[in-house]
Amino acid sequence: MFRTLLKSKIHRAAVTHCELNYEGSCAIDEDLLDAANLGENEQIHIWNINNGERFITYAIRAERGSRIISVNGSAARRAAVGDLVIIAAFAQVEEKEVAGFSPKLVFVNPDNRIKEERSTIPVQMAD
């Protein structure tokens, strides 16, 4: 049996471009792709913090060091430049490998520079 687990996450990235007439996808700075262990053409989920939109597309490379997050094609109607988004990908993991599996979590500052990388999410505590 397999479980679907979070594999990669880029947290609170700022959308830098929205290109409606570009072939559909999301262009992501290659530095961020590498840090989050995301591959070109890999399916990604995008969750827009500003408006609550959630959609699925695929990752393409943006110039390394550019800090670009470009939402393209029809998905460009679901984001605006400056919106904060969470970009995530999932993996099918065999049950026997679940205990040793950990995601690549990348946290960025407002200009999409990496500020922290982790492999765990803290337990949410009650108030």
UniProtKB/Swiss-Prot annotation:
GO terms for cellular component: cytosol. One of its GO terms (molecular function) is aspartate 1-decarboxylase activity. The modification Pyruvic acid (Ser) is found at S25. Gene3D superfamilies: 2.40.40.20. Binds 1 pyruvoyl group covalently per subunit. Pathway: Cofactor biosynthesis; (R)-pantothenate biosynthesis; beta-alanine from L-aspartate: step 1/1. NCBIfam families: panD (TIGR00223). Heterooctamer of four alpha and four beta subunits. This is Aspartate 1-decarboxylase. It comes from Polaromonas naphthalenivorans (strain CJ2).
